Amino acid sequence: MTTNTVSRKVAWLRVVTLAVAAFIFNTTEFVPVGLLSDIAQSFHMQTAQVGIMLTIYAWVVALMSLPFMLMTSQVERRKLLICLFVVFIASHVLSFLSWSFTVLVISRIGVAFAHAIFWSITASLAIRMAPAGKRAQALSLIATGTALAMVLGLPLGRIVGQYFGWRMTFFAIGIGALITLLCLIKLLPLLPSEHSGSLKSLPLLFRRPALMSIYLLTVVVVTAHYTAYSYIEPFVQNIAGFSANFATALLLLLGGAGIIGSVIFGKLGNQYASALVSTAIALLLVCLALLLPAANSEIHLGVLSIFWGIAMMLIGLGMQVKVLALAPDATDVAMALFSGIFNIGIGAGALVGNQVSLHWSMSMIGYVGAVPAFAALIWSIIIFRRWPVTLEEQTQ
């Protein structure tokens, strides 16, 4: 049974399976944001010191995405997914057993290795397995898995960490990954590598100024977001002075708003990706600039989080669609670069937030993040006027 002859129901079921896998991977990527204080207390460290773990994870993904993708470019995709899930699960067992912060970081590097491959191939696989004419909706479903990781995975992981210890959070993620692995084995067909590209693809991609401009925009806007987002949990408790339960609720609200962004993109993304991305960057800029002023009210922070979540989902989806549209002949290479560049931004933002918190004041993370957000807004306006990309419509 091939991906071309199955019913629409089976095709959607396979996409949903990938969306569940995306939920699992993004839960483990995001969940340390809600556990920094608990992990710091466990190892008798400062919260900002533990936060460097976010940078290490992200930069390992950034460094290894392209090499791993090229090393596995000829590997059948179902087998590859199974292997990376085995690494993912084993690494979470080590996280659960971590007897020092160093061991925890090593276990997270193992997770990052699996992550590097997963996000290099997932978007293109979702498009391959989607029913005819439903590629944008398939990408939106994968993004919904990402959003659910924030709206359910991150808060639930935080709650588990609060009541049973942060180690149980990682153990539970490992169990969830095992169940997902069994579903992948059952549901996915053989998936020969297609349009994966090779090192020969790199010079071709690098000669596409529109694509390179999207990559630059990605790293700048993601740096802006993660400068503040990485430390939102200690910010809410230590700067705003609100309870740990409110911090959990705020993370849930921000993630839930991402689902709204996913729905908006599913309806408008095919025709208006450029406008949506620029508008979302402007919205992110406003949210970051107002983060500290909004900290005097739970309601203000809640409303801000809704718009923040919508903005980041629109940005992430819009960038992804444009990358796929601008590199249809080497989707896996292009997405490996995108994943790596995205994680450079995550690591850079977490590092900036770390340095601001240690050497200045955690209260300033929003203002500092607004600086690259403003630069990203200007750059997006410039590049979308110079290269008014409509190619995303051709991928549908």
UniProtKB/Swiss-Prot annotation:
GO cellular component, one term: plasma membrane
Main location: membrane
Membrane-spanning intervals of the chain: 15-35, 50-70, 81-101, 103-123, 136-156, 170-190, 209-229, 246-266, 275-295, 299-319, 333-353, 364-384
InterPro entries: MFS (IPR011701), MFS_dom (IPR020846), MFS_Efflux_Transporters (IPR050189), MFS_trans_sf (IPR036259), Sugar_effux_transptr_put (IPR023495)
Compartments, record wording: Cell inner membrane
NCBIfam families the UniProt entry points to: PRK03545.1
Name the UniProt record assigns to this protein: Probable sugar efflux transporter
